[in-house]
Regions:
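Short, surface-exposed coil-to-beta transition loops
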Residues: 60-62, 80-81, 88-89, 162-166, ...
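N-terminal leader/targeting segments and the immediate start of mature chains
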Residues: 18-58, 213-225
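Gly/Pro-enriched, hydrophobic low-complexity segments
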Residues: 103, 130-217, 221-224
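An acidic-aromatic
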Residues: 64-118, 191
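Short, solvent-exposed helix-to-loop capping segments enriched in aromatics
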Residues: 36, 114-132
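Bacterial N-terminal signal peptides
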Residues: 8-17
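Short beta-strands and strand-coil junctions in structured, solvent-facing domains, enriched
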Residues: 53-54, 74, 81-84, 94, ...
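Bacterial N-terminal signal peptides that target proteins for export
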Residues: 1-8
Length: 225
């Protein structure tokens, strides 16, 4: 449990929000999942804000994200990148280039179900289909404010919920594009990503999601397998 919080940190109001009735909530969800059918690849810049109870000021860093359906992603935090979270197929690496270290996380059959559920929270903004999404999350609230849909979610996995009791997804009201994510941890700390300069379906070489550890890198496996 403790080792996953650094992983998420390495990566996850002008007017009063208006709560939507159930019927409108379903309509918004239907439109969101319909928009996902047109998403094959995605790229964006982001500003990440980490709010910790032990610090009086939040920590702010810039980064870049690449995503390819169904589940490949590359998060680069810092300019130049100080941390890279990279998933391709059934394997994910968290890479620390300056330290020449990396951590390997399996997503396939060798990964414990509890860890798989928790690591999958990294992709909450890109759901594959509604059935899988609703199996993973309970929708706590859906509001509209400042031309943005604000969706509050709770993981259904008890293990994931003990780490992160709530996460929020922000979607543009005009095209349901991902505008931001915010992860709330059990200790009250928060990690928010605000996306800008997003590009829908840019041409991406599959190699940007692949990584082979250089000989001078130390690679560890937190799962011990």
């Amino acid at each position: 449990m403790k080792m996953l919080r650094p992983l998420f940190f390495a990566l996850g109001i002008v007017c009063a929000p208006q709560m939507l009735p159930a019927g409108q909530t379903n309509a918004v969800l239907d439109a969101w999942f319909a928009a996902q059918e047109n998403l094959h690849t995605w790229s964006a810049d982001f500003v990440q804000t980490r709010t910790l109870k032990t610090l009086t000021q939040p920590l702010i860093a810039k980064g870049h994200i690449l995503f390819a359906m169904p589940n490949d992603f590359r998060w680069e935090l810092g300019q130049p990148a100080q941390t890279i979270a990279l998933r391709h197929g059934d394997e994910m690496f968290v890479i620390y280039p300056r330290l020449k270290r990396a951590e390997r996380f399996p997503f396939g059959a060798s990964a414990p179900t509890e860890w798989h559920d928790t690591l999958s929270l990294l992709q909450a903004g890109f759901p594959g289909d509604r059935k899988a999404f609703e199996a993973q999350f309970q929708i706590l609230a859906l509001t509209e404010t400042n031309r943005t849909w604000q969706m509050s979610l709770q993981p259904k996995s008890p293990f994931a919920r003990r780490l992160m009791p709530e996460l929020r997804i922000s979607l543009a009201t005009n095209d349901f594009s991902l505008a931001g994510t915010e992860l709330t941890f059990v200790d009250g700390s928060r990690l928010r990503n605000d996306f800008t300069n997003a590009v829908l379906n840019p041409p991406l070489d599959e190699k940007v999601f692949e990584w082979s550890p250089p000989a001078d890198f130390k690679v560890t496996n937190p799962f011990g397998k």
